[in-house]
């Protein structure tokens, strides 16, 4: 009975903190974007907006449904976590190499030569973010949205302030690129700081196949 009550309280707390994170994060991002819009050109947002499409598609493949499989599966093991961790990193590296290789073609397609360098830099987000996917999944499994909220808000606020300073100093589109990278880096650092988890030196094909069939 006590366990049931404790779980309910934890679930309610998780829902509340999840709502706090959502609305607070939107408020922070909205405020920062309003100010940055007055400092940057529409073309700066346009370039980053085009690249966001490629990053989102890549991110979907990197995750591959394994995060949801971990969260939904009851009898998950440390081998499962480690397998997903290594899969995410390797897949992220593969997609980054693809973006790096085809960056000149994408830039040529949009008739924007400067996109080549921007793609190769902002694409690092894929690798950085892949390092903390499992950490976030573990916190979700623990229904610990309080820590997730603190991590997300802190990262968004700090990276946003840095982006604003860069925009004010005249760095243009690089303000948005650096803001994105710093946000991803801070998220990863904070996830590692709050959750002291390390993967095993093991990748299991059996675990991979089970999670793949579970998540598909």
Regions found by a protein language model. Give the residues of each.
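Interhelical loop/hinge segments that connect adjacent transmembrane helices in multipass membrane
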Residues: 1-7, 11, 146, 189-216
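Alpha-helical transmembrane segments of multi-pass membrane proteins
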Residues: 57-61, 97, 101, 112-135, ...
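Hydrophobic core positions of alpha-helical segments in small-molecule transporters
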Residues: 17, 51, 83-87, 121-124, ...
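Alpha-helical transmembrane segments and their helix-entry boundary regions
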Residues: 14, 18, 45, 84, ...
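Signature of the first transmembrane helix
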Residues: 7-66, 91-103, 155-164, 179-187, ...
